[in-house]
Amino acid sequence: DTLIIGAGAAGLMAAIQCAQRGQSVTLLEKMDRPGRKLLITGKGRCNVTNCCTIEEFMPNVLSNPRFLYSCLNALNPYEVMGFFEECGVPLKVERGERVFPVSDRSADIVQALVDKARQLSCRLIYGCADALLIGEERVEGVSLTDGQKLYAHSVIVATGGKSYPATGSTGDGY
């Protein structure tokens, strides 16, 4: 049903959401493991979210608050916290209402996302994505490094931006 390209935070969450809605999901990551950029967030501790209402948070948004407002309404900070706690990652709130895993390990957040995706029968494939296959006006699939091509009814491109090239980010799909 759904092919997701990129196994960072957005790709993993998209895989989980699609699988929870009954779709079969294949998640492809060009690197050898998922969440490499996520591992360095919050100085390796992963600032998961902020523990405040949308109304408290919005005055701190400097650019494009309308876009962010709709995103936060779709999955607010308290729902994010509940999700990770249901996945077995206890959280704590620190100065500035920043939320971190109690362990102070971003790897625990990545592992929780991977475990949840696998629990929902998502197929995760690492180190193989090569290029997007673009048909008429849409992405139809991806070619793999071994020459194989995967197609899907729905394709989500979650390849991230160009920041932190040391993590493997090249801006593919940006």
Model-found features: residue ranges?
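Structural motif
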Residues: 2-3, 24-26, 37-38, 45-46, ...
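Cofactor-binding loop segments of dinucleotide-utilizing enzymes, especially the Rossmann-like FAD-
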Residues: 7, 30, 160
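Conserved N-terminal/central alpha/beta ligand/cofactor-binding core
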Residues: 30-123, 128
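Hydrophobic/aromatic ligand-binding patch that stacks against planar heteroaromatic rings
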Residues: 13, 17, 30, 38, ...
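N-terminal Rossmann-like FAD-binding beta1-loop-alpha1 element of flavoenzymes
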Residues: 1-27
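Gly/Ser/Thr-rich beta-alpha loop segments that engage phosphate groups in nucleotides
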Residues: 8-13, 37, 43-46, 162-163
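Predominantly flavin-linked oxidoreductase catalytic cores and closely associated redox partners
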Residues: 40, 107-174
